[in-house]
Structure formats: structure tokens, C-alpha cells
Amino acid sequence: MIAKCTDAPRRVDTLRFHTLLCLEAITFMLQQLLQPITFAQFATALFVAILFLQSGLDKVFNFADNLGWLTGHFSKTPFRNQVKAMLVTITVAEMLAGLLAMAGAVQIAWSGQLTCAMYGAQLATIDIVLLFFGQRIAKDYAGAASLVPYFILCVADVLLLTL
């Protein structure tokens, strides 16, 4: 019983120390994120993460529907026999880009490091180029045009992450 009483102040001091350490880390993180360039890097990484994770997860959970639609979409193209492989490739690439961008957003907020966000932005840019190519081959010019803002965002993200 006496040992427990003497350990109590030590436990309280340890708890205070860890609480202060967490508060310092949060303060540092907020100070980082309040810088305009860091905030823009964080926000674009988060945007790319949401965009590509949602798109990739939609393809995973609605694979059969997407495959059916894309099979018709590419039926009159040289890629008509590769639709399933293309869908799997794009799905994996989108999920990976989204995960890297999400890890990058966390990394930017926590330490200011840009590595994961850069890899995510670069892969996202390549994904958009692949989608654009597919839309052009399928002669879906409106669909291809709708990808241009995403391409601009992804390239801007890559450039922003070099600052």
C-alpha cells in the first residue's frame, strides 16, 4: 500500500510530461499548417487523397458495374479485349495514389516532410493521363475534357510540393 502511494506522484509527473509533449507537438503542427505554402501543400494532398481514394474504392465496390460500362465504352476500340486489365490497373493506381497522398497529408501536418505527398501527386498525374488517353481512344471527347481540371490540379500539386 505504501509503495502505491509513493508511485502516485511519479505517475502524475509522467502524465503531465506526456500531456505537455503532446501539446507541444500539436502546437508545432498547427504552426506549420498556418504557413501559407505548407497549408496549400497539405490541402492539395488531402484533396488528391479524397479524390483518388473515393474513385478507387468506387471501382473496387462496383467492379462489375464499372466493367460492364467500360466494356461497352471501349467496344469499338483496339482495347476492347483489355478492358478488365485496364480497369484493374487504373483501380490499383488510383488507390495507391490516394493512399500516398493521404500519407503525405499526414506527413506534411506532422513533420513538414513532402515525400509521400510528392509520390502521390506524381502517380495521380500519371493516372489522369492514362484516363485521358482512354477517353480520347474511346472518342469520348467530353469525358476527356472533364479530366483537364484534375490534370491541372495534379500538376500544380507536384509543382507546389517543390517549394
Task: Give the positions of each predicted feature.
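Short hydrophobic transmembrane-like helices used for membrane targeting/insertion
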Residues: 1-2, 12, 26
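Intrinsically disordered, low-complexity regions enriched in Ser/Pro/Gly/Gln/His and often acidic
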Residues: 3-4, 62, 112
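N-terminal amphipathic/hydrophobic targeting modules at extreme N-termini
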Residues: 5-19
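Proline-rich intrinsically disordered, low-complexity coils
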Residues: 9, 20-21, 36, 78
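Residues at secondary-structure transition points
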Residues: 13-17, 62, 104
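Extended, low-polarity transmembrane helix blocks
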Residues: 21, 27-58, 88, 92-163
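Solvent-exposed, well-ordered loop and adjacent helix/strand elements within mature globular domains
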Residues: 50-91
